[in-house]
Amino acid sequence: MRVAWLSSRQSQRRFLLSAILSAFTVWFLLPSSPKHEEQPAELARQYPMLWRHVHTFNGTGGAWYIPPSWLSSTDVQPETIVDAALLASQAAKSNKNRFIDHSNIPLLLHQTWKNRRVEKWSDLLRASVEKWLHYVVADDMAYFFWEDDGIERMLAEFEPDFAHRFGFLPSNVERADVFRILVLKWFGGIYADVDTRPLRQPTSWVSSSDLAPWSDSVTQMRFSFDNPVSSILGIEADCAPHKSDYWRMGYSYPVQLTQWALASSAGHAVLLRFMDNLQRRMDGVARRNRGNINTPEAIKELRQIGPLCLTGPVAVTVAVKTWLEERTGLRWNALTGSGDGGRSKLVEDVLILPITGFRTRQIRQYGLEAGHRPLSSSLAPGARIVAHLRPESRVRESLSDLVWVVQKLVEAARLTRSQATIEEGGRVFHYA
């Protein structure tokens, strides 16, 4: 009877786990914002800036907008998006008002998507890009919407030695990750995914309070910097380092950065470090595959590394973490906002925003300590951007939630198992 009872409990747990996994799978596949085509006149009325500056724009490699005040009468109108980005980055240098406040970061916004046919887009994407363009025009910013042809032109002109490897990255996810680093490396500015929406003007992303000196509560090391900010990054995971929450949620570090939004001056060292790390990793894969990165075995090895670690948030975190540690002696986990209400921290010329800075619609509150402010409102203090996440992005974002749930179920199973160890007549019975 006892063994049968234990077997029944085990079956119940297995059924519960199976049901939860099935529910997660179904939820992942549900679309968050259905696509539907609308008439051109209606699109032009609802999204006037998107219609004018993206959909109907006639350019090679993408669409762009450069404020008329940035151009002189002698400037030749660019024919490609690469020429336009180069022109705008040079024009920004001639006027201190063409930078984010307190920074060396030019007011250039870069976005990319597979096409400019906005009638095929979801309402979410249309509204998000329209909001960005509203700020672009109001703040006298330059804007660049990169298509595949434009990205290929940029690689051919600025990264000829890497261009062939770019094509051998396992998927479009990795290629998009690398693009955002390279476009900032060469032109500077802000990169933001098309499913994000700004909550405040990019010109005001850096305030005087963000520049205040701060100290590591463990080492007492003090950090201050008098020169302008040259890089802005946001935290996506802020977990207690002495607990296992972060890896249960699928993160590699207790404090981990995001890369769906970032800003930088051109040629910043953390961007160079990211590319050096990627090149070194791809060199190693090629070396183990007879010097070729394009063999099926090499591609398989790159896939096994995974986008998160190869080019995604983990790769960005490693690049920033190692550079700041070497440069300043920073203790990485000192960047947590759990003990100070989530304040920004400036290290060298890199500004690290708290988890509320670049945020998703629903931040995982179980990854936060009680010291953080409530995050239920989209107007969380200090928020610059909110990410709404497309269905394909929701899968990637929610994998960590799935890992966390599974880990909790495993813990519960272990606890039940220990409680169900029964001693009878000098014998100990365990369920398998």
Task: Give names to the regions the model predicted.
Residues 2-176, 192-432:
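Glycosyltransferase-associated regions of secretory-pathway enzymes
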